[in-house]
């Protein structure tokens, strides 16, 4: 893999980097004699926090100006309505047709609301209905901690203890779960499972789970008595999804990673239409409810009667933050403009494969399943090497490990990369996650990032750093 090859690929796959604000050497406080201080960084951290679309700043300022000019009246009489702005009372509704294709849902199956864990908790309360022996929740042992906390407290709210959580561990010698392993766990607990909930993409390894296959297996084996949900924090905006076609019951996601909504940005949910099409004042499924999920025509009548909207919007509890909504809208409009996730996925596969090819060609690379001398300086890749089993992320495990941060290989590599304005995500003690995103990363900068990584290991080997 050469620089010329990277440049050739950049002519084949377009970049939309100009649509984004990219941190520079100067803005990051990094001194450089090799580059102009206003040179862009190489930002490979969109799996942690996406870059800001340049249009976001104006979108937010427009709403601040509406607040200045009309105050509360902007809820129903926005000063920018003639220019296409939405009154605040309906501020989130234009996002529904933008989000639905990204997750592969019908418009009546999605809502933009809340934050990831609060949304997940709301869905769990609604969908976890233990009965007789069916009380257990199957999920992964290495789940993002917030998910574990949610599952643990959910079973405790029902009077159960931690034994009602079935946590699936990665088998010795592997770096990620296999679909067959998940199926076996379903079989082993088939009469006791009430719910199965995995991540669409595993945050640490970057593994893309076979959502359709797993969902269908659980439903068929459980005779539709087991609910299947997905945490899509690292999948939404990253890989193509078809939640409705895959018959997923519910899902939740955040938007500040691949959807570029900004830190702590507003999140979203999916609920299959079978659970909301019969909503009525007398037959709705009890949930954590609020006035923003009530029929809009009666919402401001302040009635003591819950009349849920016949869609996933009925799960909304409070009116959303206008600033958060318009921030994510800027990015969603950009996704639509460039052709959506399926089109971006083609470049994403090529870009991540290009990085993988660079890494495995290094003298410092060793296969994770090899009996390698663990005292030798080097790295392996935890992420599945099969491009269909991952998104836009490679998780790189460095060795050897030292408890002293000044000596530890990962810390030293990470520091070297940062000093060269290459922004990645550390996962202590020994992992760096690299996420080349198709929207704003190029093959050329991915090439340079890999070269700086190899330089760092050369200098560590010769004790120069």
From Swiss-Prot:
This is Kynureninase. Catalyzes the cleavage of L-kynurenine (L-Kyn) and L-3-hydroxykynurenine (L-3OHKyn) into anthranilic acid (AA) and 3-hydroxyanthranilic acid (3-OHAA), respectively. It comes from the Eukaryota. One of its GO terms (molecular function) is kynureninase activity. One of its GO terms (biological process) is anthranilate metabolic process. Disulfide bonds: none annotated. The modification N6-(pyridoxal phosphate)lysine is found at residue 257. Its main location: cytoplasm. Keywords: Cytoplasm, Hydrolase, Pyridine nucleotide biosynthesis, Pyridoxal phosphate. InterPro entries: Kynureninase, PyrdxlP-dep_Trfase, PyrdxlP-dep_Trfase_major, PyrdxlP-dep_Trfase_small. It catalyses: L-kynurenine + H2O = anthranilate + L-alanine + H(+); 3-hydroxy-L-kynurenine + H2O = 3-hydroxyanthranilate + L-alanine + H(+). Pfam families: KYNU_C (PF22580). Its EC number is 3.7.1.3. Belongs to the kynureninase family. It is found in: Cytoplasm. It is an enzyme of class 3 (hydrolase). Homodimer. Pathway: Amino-acid degradation; L-kynurenine degradation; L-alanine and anthranilate from L-kynurenine: step 1/1; Cofactor biosynthesis; NAD(+) biosynthesis; quinolinate from L-kynurenine: step 2/3. SUPFAM superfamilies: PLP-dependent transferases. One of its GO terms (cellular component) is cytoplasm. Its cofactor is pyridoxal 5'-phosphate. Pyridoxal 5'-phosphate binds at residues 116-117, 144-147, 231, 234, 256, 291, 319.
């Amino acid at each position: 893999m050469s620089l010329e090859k990277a440049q050739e690929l950049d002519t084949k796959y377009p970049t939309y980097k100009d649509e984004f604000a990219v941190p520079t050497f100067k803005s990051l406080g990094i001194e450089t004699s090799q580059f102009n201080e206003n040179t862009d960084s190489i930002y490979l951290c969109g799996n942690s926090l996406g870059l800001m679309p340049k249009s976001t700043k104006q979108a937010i300022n427009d709403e601040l100006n509406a607040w200045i000019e009309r105050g509360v009246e902007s809820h129903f009489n926005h000063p920018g309505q003639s220019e296409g702005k939405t009154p605040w009372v309906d501020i989130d509704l234009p996002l529904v047709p933008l989000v639905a294709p990204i997750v592969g849902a019908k418009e009546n199956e999605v809502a933009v609301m809340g934050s990831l864990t609060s949304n997940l908790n709301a869905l769990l309360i609604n969908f976890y209905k233990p009965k007789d022996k069916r009380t257990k929740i199957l999920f992964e042992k290495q789940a993002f901690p917030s998910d574990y906390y949610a599952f643990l407290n959910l079973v405790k709210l029902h009077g159960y203890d931690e034994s009602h959580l079935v946590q699936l561990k990665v088998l010795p010698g592997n770096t990620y779960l296999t679909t067959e392993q998940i199926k076996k766990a379903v079989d082993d607990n088939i009469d006791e499972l009430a719910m199965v909930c995995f991540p669409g993409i595993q945050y640490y390894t970057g593994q893309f789970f076979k959502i359709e296959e797993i969902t269908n297996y659980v439903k068929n084996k459980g005779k539709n008595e087991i609910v299947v949900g997905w945490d899509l924090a690292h999948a939404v905006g990253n890989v193509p999804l078809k939640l409705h076609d895959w018959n997923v019951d519910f899902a939740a996601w955040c938007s500040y990673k691949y959807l570029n909504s900004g830190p702590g940005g507003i999140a979203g949910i999916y609920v299959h239409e079978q659970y909301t099409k019969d909503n009525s004042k007398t037959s709705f499924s009890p949930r954590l409810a609020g006035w923003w999920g009530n029929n809009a025509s009666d919402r401001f009548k302040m009635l003591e009667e819950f009349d849920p909207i016949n869609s996933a919007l009925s799960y909304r509890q409070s009116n959303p933050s206008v600033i958060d909504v318009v921030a994510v809208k800027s990015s969603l409009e950009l996704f639509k403009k460039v052709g959506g996730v399926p089109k971006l996925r083609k470049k994403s596969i090529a870009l991540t494969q290009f990085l993988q090819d660079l890494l495995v060609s290094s003298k410092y690379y060793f296969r994770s399943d090899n009996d390698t001398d663990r005292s030798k300086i080097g790295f392996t890749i935890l992420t599945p090497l099969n491009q269909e089993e991952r998104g836009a992320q490679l998780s790189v495990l460095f060795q050897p490990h030292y408890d002293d941060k000044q000596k530890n290989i990962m810390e030293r590599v990470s520091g070297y990369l940062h000093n060269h304005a290459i922004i990645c995500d550390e996962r202590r003690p020994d992992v760096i996650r690299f996420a080349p995103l198709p929207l704003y990363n190029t093959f050329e900068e991915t090439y340079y990032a890999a070269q700086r990584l190899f330089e760092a290991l050369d200098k560590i080997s010769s004790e120069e750093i």
